[in-house]
Amino acid sequence: MANDTHTDDLDELLDSALDDFKDLNLTQRNGGVKKEEGDKKETESLPSGVQGLGMGLPDMRSKKKGKKKIAKEDHVTEALDKLREQTRETVKGLESLSSKQQPTGSDDAMVEDWIKQFENLTGSNDLESIVDTMMQQLLSKDILHEPMKEIGARYPKWLEEHESSLNKEEFDRYSRQYELIKELNLVYENEPNNSTKIMEIMQKMQECGQPPSDIVQEMDPGFDFASLGQMSPDMLESSPNCCVM
């Protein structure tokens, strides 16, 4: 009976992780991500409707309290199959923001390479390591640098045109956001493998909300940055009935 209960808990844990990863599908045009009641406490200090760029990312500076293990290898295999499809859609969604066209089939090849890395981690039955690796890949230079350059290039003109119509708090927030985007791009150019620094900058972006909607809409109508970063190792520490994302 104890073993059955443990297996059920693992099933629910994997289902919760995969459900949250589906929220990362940036090609969907469903108007944003549903928020759990607990999340409202973290965002109530922001203006109404503002959701952070990088919302939900774990704090890389804090120590992990432990690692979640998976007892059955078939659960990992099933999870990887689903993650392969969701990751492929996420990559395509991000690349839709960039004017730099990728060779046909490059997305699939990149995702398959990632999945091989994830599979190498399954020997330790450590789902947290898999999720951690996935986050590093999704925030890598290959994926985010071009979209961030495209967005950052539009800020100076936008800030100049809208300064008179924004209150001081809004203008300062968007200006801070622009500085963080420039800082992130510098890291991509000079320290592309510094995943800790990249993650920390993305966390700071949480405090600034999303980029101006007209900037993003100009690049790709319907695109929603709010779900970027919804996949987090911290969600594995939540109970099956309580999603922290």
UniProtKB/Swiss-Prot annotation:
It is a lipid-anchor. The modification Cysteine methyl ester is found at C242. A lipid is attached at C242 (S-farnesyl cysteine). Expressed in roots, leaves, flowers, siliques and stems. Highest expression in roots and leaves. Keywords: Cytoplasm, Lipoprotein, Membrane, Methylation, Peroxisome, Peroxisome biogenesis, Prenylation, Protein transport, Transport. Residues 243-245 form a propeptide. It is found in: Cytoplasm; Peroxisome membrane. It comes from the Eukaryota. May be farnesylated. It holds the Pfam family Pex19. Residues 17-106 are annotated as: Disordered. GO terms for cellular component: cytosol; peroxisomal membrane. Residues 33-44, 71-92 have a biased composition (Basic and acidic residues). Its main location: cytoplasm. Residues 96-105 have a biased composition (Polar residues). Contributes to morphology determination of peroxisomes, but not to import of peroxisomal matrix proteins. Required for proper post-translational import and stabilization of peroxisomal membrane proteins (PMPs). Acts as a cytosolic import receptor for PMPs and delivers them to the docking factor PEX3 at the peroxisomal membrane for subsequent insertion into the membrane. Acts as a chaperone in stabilizing or maintaining PMPs in the lipid bilayer. Dimer. Interacts with PEX10 (via C-terminus). Belongs to the peroxin-19 family. PANTHER family: PEROXISOMAL BIOGENESIS FACTOR 19. This is Peroxisome biogenesis protein 19-2. It comes from Arabidopsis thaliana (Mouse-ear cress). The gene is PEX19-2.
